[in-house]
């Protein structure tokens, strides 16, 4: 593993430092389709330190999970393609948009579909990854009806993109044939667990 997820975090942090230069953010902010390069550049911009830190944490955590299973090339492909998909959704719904969360939600979508039983903490509660992803998705759907500075449609588009990729990449599970238990197996289980 080459830790591209952490390298992306480093690039995003460096861009945030550059955003302190007057006019930098405005030059690369997504504000419609008239400047198509901003579909990509806006992914690396963040509105404030909390926005930045929450996205860096999520990208580091879920990006490393993704990268360890699928590799760095697929990580970059999903990050950029999912980020562009979420930027396109944002351009339809918001006057201006920035942030890596749509790209991160694409990564989360792949992880949720391909590693659904992996336990993660969400809202202080341990739960399977697929359940956590559904909770986040439902929060974003609810957020659409309560306007805020969060680009909920970007999150939803990123998650949908990632889930579609995850379904395409998912390997069929090997089914274990159901064989009847015999008395010896039951006794062994009782000795171990009772």
State where each predicted segment sits.
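A detector for small-residue-rich transmembrane helices and their helix-helix packing motifs
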Residues: 1-194
């Amino acid at each position: 593993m080459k830790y591209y997820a952490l390298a992306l975090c480093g690039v995003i942090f460096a861009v945030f430092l550059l955003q302190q230069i007057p006019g930098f953010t405005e030059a690369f902010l997504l504000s419609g389709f008239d400047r198509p390069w901003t579909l990509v550049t806006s992914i690396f911009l963040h509105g404030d330190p909390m926005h930045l830190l929450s996205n860096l944490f999520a990208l580091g955590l879920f990006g490393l999970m993704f990268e360890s299973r699928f590799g760095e090339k697929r990580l970059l492909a999903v990050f950029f393609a999912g980020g562009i998909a979420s930027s396109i959704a944002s351009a339809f719904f918001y006057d201006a948009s920035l942030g890596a969360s749509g790209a991160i939600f694409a990564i989360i979508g792949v992880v949720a579909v391909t590693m659904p039983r992996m336990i993660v903490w969400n809202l202080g509660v341990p739960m399977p990854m697929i359940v956590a992803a559904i909770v986040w998705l439902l929060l974003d759907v609810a957020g659409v009806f309560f306007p805020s500075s969060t680009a909920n449609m970007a999150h939803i588009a990123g998650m949908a993109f990632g889930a579609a990729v995850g379904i395409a990449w998912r390997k069929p599970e090997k089914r274990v044939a159901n064989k009847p238990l015999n008395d010896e197996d039951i006794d062994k289980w009782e000795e171990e667990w009772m």
